[in-house]
Amino acid sequence: HEIGMDFEIDFANAISEKTPNLCHLAPAGHTYIEDLNEAGGVYAVMNELNKKGLLHTDCMTVTGKTVGENIAGCENKNPEVIRPIDNPYTQTGGLAVLKGNLAPDGSVVKRSAVVPEMMVHEGPARVFDCEEDAIHAVLTHEIQPGDAVIIRYEGPKGSGMPEMFLSLI
């Protein structure tokens, strides 16, 4: 909205579908943002993605240089933190758009934080309008094993896609 450009949620899904997941940072993984920085940082991740032609390296950036100029020479110093492009954690990115009766216009899930056995789930849905209400329900034992916890009004149009892990404790 800030730049006056329409952005369809399906476009984000299409990008994630063709972008491999190269990092598995906490809380979903065993490495931390500090480890990513020591391994070469975001530019090293971008350099890996560029090996498969996934970036428009001729685009100008706020640095006054192109993407390609910015990532030139940024090597992956730790393949345990930043997986090589030919050995990703998953072939698809960390986000996915879900659609259905609970979210007919779509909702965003952090696919990389979902354990494989939960990729398909049937059960009651507990719907909350904010994370605080969901946390309250967890702390007062209103959430039962097998309940799907849905937190509405968070994300790109809400509070900017904060981590929702507090409601899972």
Go through each PLM region and give its residues.
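Catalytic or ion-coupling anion/metal-binding cores of large enzyme and transporter domains
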Residues: 1-169
